[in-house]
């Protein structure tokens, strides 16, 4: 069976933990989109890790981890991540990298940095990982596929073409030194040597695995609201964040995806710019940020303080719908145990009218949150294993959210560890 783990909101929902947990019973874990611009935090017996490109199955010796064709592949970072976990006592993971994946080049990162600098106060809040320039090149058909690293004549011709294309912009718009074909060839040769042991036709591998009845877990990055088509455009990422894209980014038939686990926090958080209707500020936000996550709410990639807010039923209902959700995993519920009452955003007021439908960005910028307040439970719920053992007000909070988003909450995370999970109403 193929199942996907994806995000309902702006990313940072806790997908890494849920993937790590579900991976125990999987044979293969696949990253199918995005790059090193977001991190998945995992806490296990080896310690606490922030993975940026490696699939979250790397901590299990029985799993084959696949980086699919849809990923923005930063080869030095992948190799560094592998070495980083091995240095901390994790056995070397089984890893396959698609021969059709495309490569994040050093000039993609340079262009990303230069453009953010040029835009100044109107920037997109990029992590400066080269993602937008990478995908721009991919769809302009001037990117480098992994398979091309092994064809020297093709590389020699292509690097000259890249220099001719990029240098006018570098020199005249950004006032930076020109690229040289020699330097680009040297960079590509170093990438070839690094990636060679892992390269495979991963689409064929996955096709055969599915045919044999293997359990495949597709691991998404970011969340529905960062999708370039359906999210808070233009403050979005550059690849689709939806489970449906898993078929494309991994190279498997769409009808094989039987289960979609959509992860949502019990409150809201976001990194980067863009509309965030239930956002809170000041001491209220600082307190939630300090208590949140595992060691505070700070970006796994940038270390930036995350923007904080209360749970948003409007955004989460929309995000779950887009993902084709079969199950919701509700995370970091334990964080809210300090509150006397908990506000939940149940609607948006736009131009004097209240809606429960998620609008396009122009209207979203004008939206004001409509809150209902629920009583808190004022205790620590870590260590609880059964739903019935949760405090009554905690159960009421879960059931209130479930009713408003319209999708079943079947997993509740009440701590950072693998074992901190409560299963509920699973089919």
Which residues does each predicted region cover?
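Non-transmembrane, aqueous-exposed alpha-helical and coiled segments at domain scale
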Residues: 1-427
């Amino acid at each position: 069976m193929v199942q996907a783990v994806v995000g309902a909101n702006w990313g940072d929902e806790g997908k890494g933990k849920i993937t790590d947990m579900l991976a125990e019973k999987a044979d293969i874990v696949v990253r199918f989109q995005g790059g090193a611009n977001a991190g998945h935090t995992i806490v296990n017996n080896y310690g606490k890790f922030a993975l940026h490109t490696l699939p979250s199955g790397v901590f299990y010796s029985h799993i084959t981890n696949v980086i699919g064709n849809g990923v923005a592949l930063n080869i030095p970072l992948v190799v560094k991540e592998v070495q980083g976990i091995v240095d901390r006592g994790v056995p070397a993971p089984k890893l396959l990298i698609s021969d059709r994946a495309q490569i994040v080049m050093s000039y993609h990162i340079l262009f990303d940095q230069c453009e953010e600098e040029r835009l100044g106060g109107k920037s997109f809040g990029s992590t400066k990982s080269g993602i937008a320039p990478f995908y721009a090149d991919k769809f302009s058909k001037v990117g480098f596929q992994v398979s091309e690293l092994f064809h020297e004549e093709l590389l020699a011709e292509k690097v000259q073409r890249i220099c001719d294309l990029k240098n006018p912009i570098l020199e005249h718009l950004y006032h930076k030194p020109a690229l040289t074909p020699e330097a680009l060839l040297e960079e590509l040769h170093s990438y070839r040597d690094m990636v060679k042991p892992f390269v495979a036709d991963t689409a064929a591998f996955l096709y055969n695995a599915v045919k044999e009845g293997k359990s495949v877990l597709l691991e998404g990055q970011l969340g529905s609201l960062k999708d370039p088509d359906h999210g808070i455009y233009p403050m979005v990422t550059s690849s689709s964040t939806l489970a449906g894209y898993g078929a494309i980014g991994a190279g498997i038939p769409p009808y094989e995806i039987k289960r979609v686990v959509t992860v949502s926090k019990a409150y809201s958080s976001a990194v980067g710019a863009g509309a965030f209707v239930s956002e809170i500020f000041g001491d209220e936000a600082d307190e939630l940020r300090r208590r949140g996550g595992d060691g505070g709410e700070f970006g796994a990639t940038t270390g930036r303080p995350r923007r904080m807010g209360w749970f948003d039923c409007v955004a989460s209902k929309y995000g779950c719908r887009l993902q084709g959700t079969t199950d919701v995993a509700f995370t970091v519920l334990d964080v809210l145990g300090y509150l006397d009452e908990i506000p939940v955003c149940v609607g948006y007021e736009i131009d004097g009218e209240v809606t429960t439908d998620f609008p396009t960005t122009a209207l979203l910028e004008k939206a004001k949150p409509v809150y209902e307040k629920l009583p808190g439970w004022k205790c620590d719920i870590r260590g609880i294993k059964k739903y019935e053992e949760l405090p009554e007000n905690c159960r009421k909070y879960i059931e209130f959210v479930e009713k408003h988003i319209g999708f079943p909450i079947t997993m509740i995370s009440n701590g950072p560890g693998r074992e901190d999970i409560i299963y509920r109403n699973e089919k």
